[in-house]
Amino acid sequence: MKDKILWLSLNKFEVHKMDRTIQMKYRPDKEEITLTIYIKLLDDEKTLEFSYENAEGLEIENVRLLDDSLWITDSEDGYIIVPVREGLLIPSNSGRTFIHTFETFSYEGCHMEMLGVVKNRSAILITWHDPYVIAEVKSTLNSSAVQAKQILSLSLDLRKTAKAFKITFLGNGDYITIARAYREEAKKKGWFKSWRQKIREVPDAAKLIGASNFKLWSCLDRRLDYRMNEKSVTVNWTFEEVTKIAEHLKKDLGIEKALFVIGGWIHRGYDNQHPDILPAAPECGWNERLAEASKRIKNLGYLFCLHNNYQDIYRDSPSWSEDLIMKSQDGQLVKGGFWAGGQAWLICSKMGLELAKRPQNLPKVKELFNPNAYFTDTTFAAGLYECYDPKHPLTKWDDMKYKQELCNYTISLFGVFGSECGREWAIPCSHFFEGLVGVSGRYFHTLDPESMGARVIPLFEMVYRDCIAIYGKYGYDYSRAAEYIIYHIVIGRPLHYHTWSRGLYWEKAPKDEPQGWPYDSSCFIRADNGWAEGLCMIDRFIKNTHEVLSPLHEITAETIVTKHEYLTPDFRVEHVVFGEDVNVVVNKASGEFGRIFGYKDYVYNSKIAGEVILPPYGFVIESPTFIAFHALSWNGVKYEKPVLFTIRSLDGKPVSESRITKNKSFSWIWRVKNKN
């Protein structure tokens, strides 16, 4: 059988029934070896487990047990859900043809070990527990095999250690039903770890609840070309300026909760000479100034977080050694990306853990600066790797193990820990993900939902919301970010503020900055007649959005999304319920020429405030202790222009009977009606 590829057909199997199991055995002609497939009905009476085993001598490269199966036609009101970033719903009536693969735990692949299928309001959950599973979603138009305009189908490839998957029939249901079922499965796998457990172990983790993510990416920005020649060295912020920015956020803008992250603090700057990080960048103030920054920023009540990397190494790093680097099957060094420090090479995760533990690395960072949070770049973002160096071989399972050990070691030193993007295998050993929500102000990085006619849904919030803080990553244009803000309101997550001007930005802001327009994507930089009037654009945007998203996260962090629905046929208006009593309605319509939805107000009948008129990018949040809206009318009051307004209980009692704080971000006229 060596070097022989077999395509197995089900009609050549010997089929046997054994109690609750169907056994299908394949024997190639004139061969003694066998492949056996099992289909077992589990004790819950609604789950089928598919598995296989191969006889000794038969090497399996790939088994596709589902091949264009579980298909749905355009007339069957169906869809497939994929857990990529927040979640993707791919309908069976999009009119598009495509084939898209989602590899388990890869970049924009399946970030959870599951898929869901709904057909005529009947739901099934597909689960597995192995990183060597690859899902394929296929859409075919006008197939001759079935009388349908479109067929949406699913395939699963099992490779190497992947031997099984399960299909659970959930009966009448939708993607919320599927998410609830998978949440219980995640607990059985050991991926689930709640906020309560994490805060009990690391009390500072509570500071993430309601915290926005403020990140100064490159304090020192050193650029090399492909020949490792230095092109430029730029100081964007000294450590003293870093401190003043944090103090400005707290004292001038009133930002109470923040995850304050700095990158480019290491010896040669951002993405340079890893893993040789010390002393801190001399151009920015050396160790002494960074230690002072850490102390002062922590004294603000913030999480002070340092950005680091134990996957990339550069040829000019003092620790450079080919012995550290992953090897491909043909023995070649494995390349990473081309970053500020030039061509990066990928450190084997076993060796990366050893480097992190060196006295001059994380232990010394703890001793010198004592941050109360830490971030390791790329640890969760990159897919799980294999290494073929005989000195430190890795399977994907091994790579996961060593990365989890790096997380837990970092937690043991600093407390709060996070990394890039996020995968469910990292939930038990981290406190925040940076990048799972979105990338550069968009829902995805390279994946294009429109190519599949797909919609983003808050799937992650239905499964793991009460386990971890999650953010987007990279900079974006604050003056055109309204849709991104509305998306964050739907998922109830604080924003990431990663776009900054050099130095003390508010002192250097130009006089002619855009002021925003009420009905387009610049609406959240407005401040006319509001609290933020007179501030620079960055500060207006921060204040307007933080005052909505921070308290929304605070009151919902330990709940899950229990309801999500579209209130209009074009999907522009969404209704979300967190837990039992936090209701959110958003209008994603745009007032801008050429946008997908076009200008349209939406009238929402609120139980609290009666008729609420939501303009393009309007929203209303209603709960017993927090109310916020961007609306043209609320509680019987009509406004000439959309108003952004928040009302919050200060004592935990319902707003109608408590001491409250009011924040008017922009308006022409405003009132608050209160029983008291």
Which ranges hold each PLM region?
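Active-site-proximal substrate-binding groove within the catalytic cores of carbohydrate-active enzymes
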Residues: 129-134, 139, 153-169, 173-178, ...
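Aromatic-lined carbohydrate-binding/catalytic grooves of carbohydrate-active enzymes
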Residues: 207-358, 367-376, 380-391
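Short C-terminal domain-edge/linker segments immediately following a structured domain
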Residues: 80-85, 94-96, 290-293, 336-338, ...
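Short acidic, gly/pro-rich beta-turn/loop elements at beta-sheet edges
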Residues: 60-62, 73-75, 270, 314-316, ...
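Residue-level recognition of well-ordered secondary-structure positions
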Residues: 51-53, 250, 298, 305, ...
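Carbohydrate-recognition beta-sandwich/jelly-roll modules
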Residues: 1-259, 264, 282-284, 300-303, ...
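Glycine-centered flexibility motif
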Residues: 83, 269-270, 285, 466, ...
